[in-house]
Amino acid sequence: MKIGPLNHVGVAVPSIEDACETYRTLYGATDITTPFDMPAQGVKVCFVNLPNSQIELIEPLDEASPIHNFLQKNPKGGQHHVCFEVEDIHEAVAAMKERGATVLGEPRIGAHGTLIIFVHPKNSNGVLIELMESPKGEH
């Protein structure tokens, strides 16, 4: 397994609407997707589309959400994870485990509609890494 391109940076936010407004008014972002719920992951997300990547804004749906826990420690929000693409998520999981990394959970469908996994921050210099199977079409 070889790491692919950066897909997005995930940012946990207490209010996705307020965060979208900040990216529009402060940074001039004009291409922001409509927020949508992902009940299986306990989050609401949207993407700020940039010329070379995306910023994923993530708001917890309820107190059971892992993002809620993150915001308890970081009330204003902050960088949550960095996502890289891989060709085959199952190959990536096997390679990560073989290399001694802690993979958090099983592959599941992420916000782009492709399979994802997370690698524990202790294996990546304190950064939570999301590995996402490369979308087969445009993204």
Where on the chain are the PLM-derived regions?
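Vicinal oxygen chelate
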Residues: 6-14, 46-49, 69-91, 117
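Short, charged/polar, Gly/Pro-enriched secondary-structure boundary elements
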Residues: 55-56, 123-128
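Helix-adjacent hinge/juxtasegments
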Residues: 54-78
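Hydrophobic, ordered structural segments
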Residues: 62, 75-76, 83-86, 98-104, ...
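Intrinsically disordered, low-complexity, positively biased terminal segments
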Residues: 65-68, 104-105, 116, 121, ...
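Core segments of cupin and vicinal oxygen chelate
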Residues: 1, 11-54, 92-102, 106-114, ...
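Amphipathic N-proximal alpha-helical interface segments
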Residues: 60, 129-134
